[in-house]
Curated annotation (Swiss-Prot):
Subcellular location(s) of the protein: Golgi apparatus membrane
Function: Beta-1,3-galactosyltransferase that transfers galactose from UDP-galactose to substrates with a terminal glycosyl residue.
Protein's name in the database: Probable beta-1,3-galactosyltransferase 8
UniProt record, GO biological process: protein glycosylation
Name of the top EC class for this enzyme: transferase
Gene: B3GALT8
Matching Pfam families: DUF4094 (PF13334), Galactosyl_T (PF01762)
UniProt entry tagged with the keyword Acyltransferase: no
Organism lineage: Eukaryota, Viridiplantae, Streptophyta, Embryophyta, Tracheophyta
Names of the cofactor(s): Mn(2+)
Length: 395
């Protein structure tokens, strides 16, 4: 049996139902397909933001680490600078302390000197120390027989003119031995020695010079302290008159200034063991007064006495003294009348009215064969009695 043909209305209703069902299905399908895309977008955005935050954190950490590193480096640098500054401060304080100690010693020294001046120190114009040795008795006799006053005349110029003249000598390596006894006997006869607490020796002249100034300043309150060798001829009147021209000036270092070669070769006379301190081989010494005769003012002699323990001594005593003067505010006076030659040089100058303060032979670092020639030099170059008689020293 055949089924009945569907009516037209039924077909239309069925079509509409199918269309609606299809539309509904497609709508759900499309809706479901778009949701994950939206979620992906949100997730990507979230992850990106998280990564940016992480990046910011890392950058912050990096900057923090760099900042800390810079701070550490800066702190190390500041600490280093602080240490350096502290070292400089300590060095300055050490220098100031040393200066203060020296000042205290100097103040005590001057206080003691002032007290002694009132009790026993004699105020004089110049102390003239004649450097001599145990073996030089004949030289001393030649000096006594010519330009050096003796006996009552020695006492008179000391009292009236303020001029003290003494032979300067230390002691032998054997205290109380034959050499010391010989000097004791000679001094007992002439009373013209200044004894030092020093063991005599040619290579100890720098020490002897230092001790001479120290001893002389402790015994006499003088305006000038002179050192002269026992083979040099001196005109006392001309010497003290020359010194008097500089009496009002502070820190005077006077003599014939020279600059000789630094001798590095061993075995030669005047060899300088510390030659390397003066630069390259062939260099010369700094300018200093030749050792035959020179003078320094009271303040410089006092400086040597006060600081004697730290004054470096070179092989040659005149170089040592020059080195002590070099670092101070000192007036170097190049006085050529203190280094005239022996006759005919000093004789011609005397005849021309330019009497020499001292005469010697450069070639011998003193008068050649002075024992034999001192009297001859004195006859030709002596100043006479007038210059010394006319000299006046006011206390």
């Amino acid at each position: 049996m055949r089924a009945k043909a569907a009516s037209g209305k039924a077909i239309i209703v069925l079509c509409l139902a199918s269309f609606l069902a299809g539309s509904l299905f497609m709508s759900r399908t499309l809706s479901r397909s778009y949701i994950p895309e939206e979620e992906d977008h949100h997730l990507t955005k979230h992850l990106s933001k998280h990564l940016e935050i992480q990046k910011d954190c890392d950058e912050h950490k990096r900057k923090l680490i760099e900042s800390k590193s810079r701070d550490i480096i800066g702190e190390v640098s500041r600490t280093h600078q602080a240490v350096k500054s502290l070292e400089r401060t300590m060095s300055t304080l050490e220098m100031e302390l040393a200066a203060a100690r020296t000042s205290d010693r100097s103040s005590e020294f001057w206080s003691e000197r002032s007290a002694k001046n009132q009790s026993r120190l004699q105020k004089v114009f110049a102390v003239i120390g004649i450097n001599t040795a145990f073996s030089s008795k004949k030289r001393r006799d030649s000096v006594r027989q010519t330009w050096m006053p003796t006996g009552e005349k020695l006492k008179k110029i000391e009292k009236e003119k303020g001029i003290v003249v003494r032979f300067v000598i230390g002691h032998s390596a054997t205290p109380g031995g034959v050499l010391d006894k010989a000097i004791d006997e000679e001094d007992s006869e002439h009373k013209d020695f200044l004894r030092l607490k020093h063991i005599e020796g040619y290579h100890q002249l720098s020490t002897k010079t230092r001790l001479y100034f120290s001893t002389a300043t402790a015994m006499y309150d003088a305006e000038f302290y002179v050192k002269v060798d026992d083979d040099v001829h001196v005109n006392l009147g001309m010497l003290v008159t020359t010194l008097a021209r500089y009496q009002s000036r502070p820190r005077i270092y006077i003599g014939c200034m020279k600059s000789g070669p630094v001798l590095s070769q061993k075995g030669v006379k005047y060899h300088e063991p510390e030659f390397w301190k003066f630069g390259e081989e062939g260099n010369k010494y700094f300018r200093h007064a030749t050792g035959q005769i020179y003078a320094i003012s009271k303040d410089l002699a006092t400086y040597i006495s006060t600081n004697q323990g730290i004054l470096h001594r070179y092989a040659n005593e005149d170089v040592s003294l020059g080195a002590w003067m070099l670092g101070l505010e000192v007036e170097h006076v190049d006085e050529r009348s203190m280094c005239c030659g022996t006759p005919p040089d000093c004789q011609w100058k005397a005849q021309a009215g330019n009497v020499c303060a001292a005469s010697f032979d450069w070639s011998c670092s003193g008068i050649c064969k002075s024992v034999d020639r001192m009297a001859r030099v004195h006859r030709a170059c002596a100043e006479g009695d007038t210059p010394l008689a006319n000299f006046r020293f006011f206390v």
